[in-house]
Amino acid sequence: MKVAIVGGGIIGLFTAYHLRQQGADVVIIEQGEPGGWSKAAAGILEFTRFVINRINVRSYPKRYLSMALRGDARIKTWDWRWISAYLRAWGREPTQDMWEAIKTLGEYSWRQYRALAEAENDFAYSEEPLYEVGIDVAAALEEAKRDPLSPKVETGRCCGREALVYLDAAKLSTEDFVARMLRELQGVQMVRRRAQEVAGREVWLEGGDVVKADAVVVAAGYWARKFGIPVAPFKGYGFRTTAKAQSMFIEMTKGVAVVPLPKWTKVTGRFDLDGTEDHSPSARVLQRAREVLGNFEVLDMSVGYRPCTPDGFPIVDKVGEVVIVTGACRLGWTYGPALGKLAADLALGKPGVEALTARRFRR
């Protein structure tokens, strides 16, 4: 069976990985560098904690407006269909079925990363605490007690301040992990072209060529909006730097995540509703990071567009004959292994997970 995957980000790569394990012939269609749009992520994995994605809680618009007024967020892409879906989802609590699905995604992904690291840890995988500073720690502890995923948290100190310590976290080097996945996928056909349209089992490429397959998976982030999926691009910036840090932490008041790795320290920031190629806010990330870390050199910068649904939960569904996997927002890396497996299973004719379908936005 031949499966064409549109999108070579982390979820597209995991989809290809699982399809290949099940004996499928796979072709990945990606206009840029495979994994290129995913490298900007910090590499923080939060398997039992979803709070960072809860963008539809009633308090979130006020928080986002505060970020924008401080200059730490902006809106450049006005997708009125997405905004309309957001207003309908605003304040809506997830179903128990959704929480069960998310719990299963986290458990599966955790096992997958561990297994890959045990085979060869060439991507700096490490399970260690994540510190959050600049928050109301007491309130966060109370919130964690009510969390359906039962995250392990405690009070600690980081950067000379009181912090919430999330104990189930892990980290990896996104750059090194993409390289690892490409080695795992040696022999998979890579088509470095832009996909213009998907029609049933055909992918029409820029220039007029057509890729035909027995099944098509679209794992191309917010491009899924072409299929009527409510998903929007929230841009972020990632820097490999020479900064020094003892622990993995997020400075919430400045909107900066810091991940120390063996060869560099990753610094990331911004959550801009922005699908443009204007990357000028990246300077603000560095400014904010230097307020925390002092001066450092930048080795390189990468940009990513997090595909976010109005409720922050991912979608794995079929639209006609096409499998769509998107919408994991800030947790695409955390749930990448499991979402790739679900997308692969759908492409092979296996059943999906009802809670993760797009039907929840049509109710």
Swiss-Prot record:
It holds the Pfam family DAO. Optimum temperature is above 70 degrees Celsius. PANTHER family: D-AMINO ACID DEHYDROGENASE, SARCOSINE DEHYDROGENASE-RELATED. Catalyzes the dehydrogenation of D-proline. Can also use other D-amino acids, but with lower efficiency. Belongs to the DadA oxidoreductase family. Homotetramer. This is D-proline dehydrogenase.
